[in-house]
Design a protein with these regions (language model features):
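Catalytic cores of eukaryotic secretory-pathway lumenal/extracellular enzymes that build
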Residues: 1-151, 156-158, 163-169, 177, ...
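P-loop NTPase catalytic cores that bind/hydrolyze ATP
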Residues: 154-157, 182-186
């Protein structure tokens, strides 16, 4: 599961390695069925009529796997907001999902830092967000205002996305091509432009805010499946 401003493009290089490991020196017995969907409102998936958040998307993907594709169980992997969705899958749908793999810690229970080390991390995080949080505030509160300007501007969409990729990546000497090829960057951007989903993709932040943001419900329920 991808996030924002990601797409299925970020998984293209690994799909065949998982579905046909024997082609890469592995064993065919280790092969997986791999389902790589665009999130609702992103890319070539259907667009919701109003903003929905990661928890609702988790329910949609669980239905996709169990009812539509008729798997008895599955594993979920996600990064960025895809990790948020995977968390909710593990939280709400553990009867079907047997494990989740996340590469971004996007969810937590509504209790503050537990020790001095965590308090120091929280201070660093809060300071960083002063410079990094503008896009999220805009997309979580007034996404349509932004969208009216972006939908007619491929350059605007490219700039909005590239700035995030640059800021969030571990680059060598500030060179974005040390982490991504131009083809990969442009392919990801074109998914948003060609499918005309910059607007509905940005809604996920509005939906997440309405669902409670970064916090699980204050009921002390845990994700019990392997994580």
């Amino acid at each position: 599961l991808h996030g924002w401003p990601g797409s299925v493009v970020e998984f293209l290089h690994i799909i065949e390695k998982l579905t046909h490991p024997e082609k890469f020196g592995g064993n065919i017995e280790d092969a997986f069925d791999v389902i790589v969907p665009s999130l609702p409102g992103f890319g070539f998936s259907d667009r919701p009529s109003k903003p929905i958040g990661p928890r609702k998307m988790a329910a949609i993907f669980n239905k996709l796997m169990i009812e539509n594709l008729e798997y008895k169980n599955y594993l979920a992997q996600g990064g960025d907001l895809g990790a948020t969705i995977a968390n909710w899958i593990g939280y709400d749908h553990s009867k079907s999902c047997k494990a989740i793999h996340i590469n971004c810690l996007t969810m937590r229970h509504p209790h503050g830092p537990q020790n001095k080390e965590e308090e120091e991390w929280q201070k660093r995080f809060d300071k960083d967000q002063i410079m990094q949080d503008g896009y999220r505030t805009q997309q979580a509160t007034k996404p349509q205002t932004l969208s009216y300007g972006m939908m007619d501007s491929p350059v605007g969409i490219a700039a909005w996305i590239i700035e995030k990729m640059y800021s969030w990546s571990d680059l060598k000497d500030g060179d974005i091509e040390s982490a991504y090829s131009k083809d990969t960057l442009l392919a990801n951007i074109m998914v948003y432009i060609v499918s005309k989903t910059f607007n509905t993709a940005s809604w996920i932040y509005y939906g997440r805010r309405e669902e409670g943001g970064r916090f699980f419900p204050n009921d002390f329920k845990k994700i019990e499946i392997p994580t």
